[in-house]
Amino acid sequence: MEGPSNPGENLGIISVNPNTCESIELTNQILAKTYTTSWTDMEVYARGNGRICTAYPDVDHPLQDVRGNVSSILERGERSGGFETHPPRDPVTPRERHGNIQTRGAVIAPTPFHVVAAIPQQTRKRRWDILDGMVRRTVSQSTVDPKTVVMCVYRREEEETYDVLDEEEQDDDLLGIPNPTPRRLRISQAGPQQNSWVDTRGRRAYGSQEEQDERTSTDQVSIFSHDETRELSSPLECPIVGCTASFVGPRRWEKAKSHIYGVHSLEEVREIPRGELICKGIVRCETCATLLPTSDRAKQAHRDDCRPYLPRKENIRRKRAAEREATEASAQQGIALRLERQGPYITPRDIEEPTNTTTESWWREKVATKRYLHRKEWPQWLDICRTVLLGYSASSQGERHQRQVMLLDLVRNHLHTRTARREQQQQRGKDNQEEEDRQKKEEKSLRNAWKPCASSVRQGGQPSSSQPKRLNRWSTAPKWLKQSGNCTRRRISMIFPGPPVEQPGVVSVDAEEVAKTIARRLTRGAAPGLDGWTRELLYPLTLDPALKMEIAAVVKDIINADVSMEVGRRLQATSLTVLRKPNGKYRPIGAESVWAKLASHIAISRVMKTAEKKFSGIQFGVGGHIEEAIAKIRKDFATKGSLAMLDGRNAYNAISRRAILEAVYGDSTWSPLWRLVSLLLGTTGEVGFYENGKLCHTWESTRGVRQGMVLGPLLFSIGTLATLRRLQQTFPEAQFTAYLDDVTVAAPPEELKNVCAATAEAMEALGIVNNADKTEVLELTGDTGFGTAVKRVREFLERTWPDPMSEEIREGVEKKAMETDRLFKAIVELPLYNRTRWRILAMSAMPRITFLLRNHDMQHTHRVASWFDERTTQVMEHILGQPMTERARNIAALPVSMGGCGIRRMAQVAEYAHQCAGEKGLQQRKTEEADQRQQDDLYATLGGADRQVFTANTAAGAGRPLTDAQVRLDDATFGVYLRERYCRVLPEGVKCLCGEDASNHHIHTGTKVHNKPRQMRHDIINSVFANGLRLCGFQCATEPRLNEVSKRRPDILIAGLDTYAVTDITVTYPGRVTVGNTAQGQRSVAAADPMKAALVAFQEKERKYSYWAIQNGLAFAPFVMLTNGAIFGKSRDWLRRVLRGQDHRLTVTTAFDGITADVVAAVLRGNVHVYSAAQARGETLR
């Protein structure tokens, strides 16, 4: 061990030169002999360009003399020597303004729980090397926020020159003081005494004597530089949980990869938490689960290898899409891609930072936005969403958190209404002015912060009498350092339990599952949350394959609570809507974000099968088993003799949230819900009441689950399940049946009072108070014990259950069914399109009566079903404008796929609906059997062209006007379409202009029709078809010549980027072909071919133009349609191929659906012209 040669000018350096494999032992005695210290004053000054900064050393430890070359450390926000120090205005400048002080490094805290080191580059000014674990990156000084710097390391610069050192050596020789070698030229005493030509970093220069002697060792003292320091060969541990393998050596990363992919499975690699991988300097590709270092070069190399093989056209299409994306609204994406990588993710519950939600714009006002978009607006909406979503799954955790915030702001920024846009611009100007004022105030405070500090130092550390108020204001800590111990959010969140320490694996999400959930599970037309997203705005994104994958990644992060603190608060916050109940009271409804709804649906699907087993026999509210609950209650009532129906007052909002969280976290069955429940209910949520878009009042949600929350019914059932099971064990003679918050207790009459009292007490322990006004007691015989004597405990409404065979049940069922009459009157009286009336009748009126039929005996529902069928027939006749025949009503009762209209006869359903209650799928099977018998009976009564038309109505696409909202029809067109399905459009006895009977077959096949209406229909279809292709970027020419002498002309010639096609459009009547088809000799529709007429027309056109198309290199297929709107299968396939070959803004599915919907509507409008031309003059179709 060697100490400094001059203790008076201690350099603070101890050099240790052990032999190979020799241990090093340092004791106080050894250090005392080699190293000496000296005491200095309590203050150390670092002056620079008129600024004064003071650092106070710890009084318990001596400080080295600063006259030599030592480092000075300044910390922010810490008290030293009894007074709080303040940093300079810009603590991260590469060089201080004073010439003899240099900044050597800094410690930066981007978040309260994560720090990084910053080292200035020596060669490039205003550039810093950020060291974040094993990751190193270079950033500009402007990207470093001075407020995040917690400590700066300074070093005094050596100003001595060689001439000055020579003079100092002569002076020292005269005084007899040994002169040490200058630091930059000093080498070990073991080396030669002459100049060895060693540079400042200890490297031998060219031409030195030691250049060729590799055995000569020097113990040089070089300046520390992270660039020249090699990484330590620390062992690399296997990231798989439970594996203890570790690897050392220069190729330890290759060994670790071989071990992981050779020993562990792919599922284990996917389950590794992302934060744990980042701590080890590793990232995972979410596509193929490959592990690779956290370097941009490694990521880029892997992206090229991970991409699947794509054909040339697909590569061209993607390249153009990328170029278009780069030129349209890519500024936000560029900012997101330059975000700094953050540390391991910490759940929002663990972060203690003060939040003031009332100052955030997304909470202060509720912007009026569009809830749905027209299909023509989808391409622009997809382009906007691509700027945020594309690349989300390949981004780091910090980028994902930033993109999540941008995603929640998309609707508010791009789809707000005109009035909301104007108000938002005005508010934005006010916010910008407030922000500028705040920044100016902070800059002024920082600029003057050092003046009182320096003044107090000159006066011996005591502030002057004129400064106390200013010091009190300046001595406060920065905002980000303030602790939130007295914050309401922190105090309340502490009472909520957290999930278990050992979390389950990451919940995986499939893109196809997400698309199906959006299309089928999310409620149509539901009110949006504060972010403005709705199901209708989310659905177009599922039609793009790339965006569908990114949506799945977003949902996966939400389910696993991998979101930022701001996103967590925004998913918790709700807008309160108050609805009035029939009894005059109010029900609060909280509109949840559609992203939280989507994640909740996916999470529920992971536990639904287990939940049905958990709730079996006692809780029927999860899964919609209302019929089973009713059947059980009736059985228990007949067995026990009495029952009580209990209802909790505001049960959803009153139940203890702590009880819910303890029940969820206490059972590993619900582990897929842990992270999501902790995100949505683990802390207090903000509830706001808005009036005209302005926030009027706020509450903090600390109890229960919000009504309108997708997870609400499941969490409420979990919270009450243990109490119900415990009551069942305590009272074995009673039976408990719960449907969410409605609890029914069946017990012997003498025990019912005690059981109900115990049930009410147990529910009150959970926070649910029994509502006496809604409580009913039913009995067959005996006294239940409820009366005025127990009014002090709880009041019950007592009545006697009537005889099951009495007329009171039938009257009650009829009274309930008569409430549907208001819907029938609204359908007839409101100014609606006929197509809208039909949809309301089919989708809203029918399910209302089905519930009564399933839960009551046929003798009580037969009269109700007959009345419902009569009112339904009256509404259909009003829509058609003419009376309906018995055959037409039978056709309308069939499903749309079987050639009908989906308006079933409820009298027929009532015969077996009640018998099927409690048996899954039984009613559906019986209904299908009844429909098949009715279809076969109708098919047997029809003949000739009518049978062909009835068969063609079962073809795919023939019922699209009844089910697809894209096919927009006026009242006259929709009326003709419905009457054609009933086999006759014009009334009986109406003659054509030619004198023949005006049947459907004659109108479509007659040759003596004036004004050529069928040709007009053909021209309309050609125009609509060509316009649809032009919207997709094609160039279309109508009726090109085959050659100079031929009169044959196909309808449309299509030219695209790599597509050249031609087609001829044909509309044919199904009843035209009556020989050699299924109309002869077939006894059922199932054996018939609904597209026989279309097949014949397709073959004729193919023989006519296919040879010419092959000669000219054109993709040809006839586009054949039936008069009911059905399109031939080969024609549909040809159109998809054409659309797939062109690079356009619409997806293939969107373009195909839009073109075919417009063409179907054009065909049906053309049918109106055909029937109008055949009618007598002066008469028009309704």
Curated annotation (Swiss-Prot):
Residues 77-97, 163-220, 317-339, 418-478 are annotated as: Disordered. Residues 456-475 have a biased composition (Polar residues). Keywords: Nucleotidyltransferase, RNA-directed DNA polymerase, Transferase, Transposable element. InterPro entries: DNA/RNA_pol_sf, RT_dom. It is an enzyme of class 2 (transferase). Residues 560-790 form the Reverse transcriptase domain. Residues 163-174 have a biased composition (Acidic residues). SUPFAM superfamilies: DNA/RNA polymerases. GO terms for molecular function: RNA-directed DNA polymerase activity. Its EC number is 2.7.7.49. Transmembrane segments: none annotated. Residues 420-446 have a biased composition (Basic and acidic residues). Coiled coil: none annotated. It catalyses: DNA(n) + a 2'-deoxyribonucleoside 5'-triphosphate = DNA(n+1) + diphosphate. This is Retrotransposable element SLACS 132 kDa protein.
